[in-house]
Amino acid sequence: MAVTINFESDTATGQTWNRPNPNGNNPPTSLSGFATATQYTSQQFFVDTSGLYNFFSKSISPDSWDNYTYLYQNSFNPTTPLANLLIGNDDFSNTTGQSGFNNVSLTAGTQYFFVNTGFTNNDFGTFTSSITGSGNITLGNVADVPEPVSILGTLIGTIYGVGLSRKYKHLKKTTKV
């Protein structure tokens, strides 16, 4: 059963970068010569199941601004836009205003960044995106999710603390008599 997560954002208030050039290679190997100050947003996410995932983004407003999407693994730094870049796409299914890629192999527990930007410096606006795959997709930083051992340690500490508190209250009652 496929799992899908949807989110909406806006590049109009985003920072700018020199986006990678599509040049037919994936991952792209050069920077654009004309999209040198393009606004972007980056959405961190991770998956809990390794497998193939699909990505789709559609521009909303202004109508059909020409969006472009990229996928990064481990980290994303707009000052080094070719580092950690896995794939980029413009005009998904040859449709301006839609971008994405299918059957991208992701690894469970790895941090990824889905970047939405414009094709040119004048392309920006709101968009909706979706990520679909076989596992749960969590928006955010993988480092913010506690490890099971941490959860167990917290639970044991809480139980121990409650036990000590009850013992202290019991001792307090018996010493008053």
Q: Which sequence ranges carry the predicted segments?
A:
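C-terminal edge strands of extracellular/lumenal beta-sandwich accessory domains
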Residues: 3-28, 32-48, 71-85, 104-143
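C-terminal membrane-anchoring or membrane-association module
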Residues: 162-177
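Exposed aromatic-hydrophobic patches
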Residues: 98-104
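Extended, low-complexity, turn-rich repeat/linker tracts enriched in Gly/Pro/Ser/Thr and Asp/Glu
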Residues: 60-66, 122-123
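Short amphipathic, basic-aromatic surface patches that mediate peripheral association
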Residues: 53-60
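Short beta-strand/loop motifs in extracellular/secreted proteins, especially
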Residues: 51-53, 65-67
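Extracytoplasmic beta-sandwich strand-turn segments characteristic of Greek-key/jelly-roll folds
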Residues: 82-98
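A short, hydrophobic C-terminal helix/tail in secreted or cell-surface proteins
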Residues: 146-166
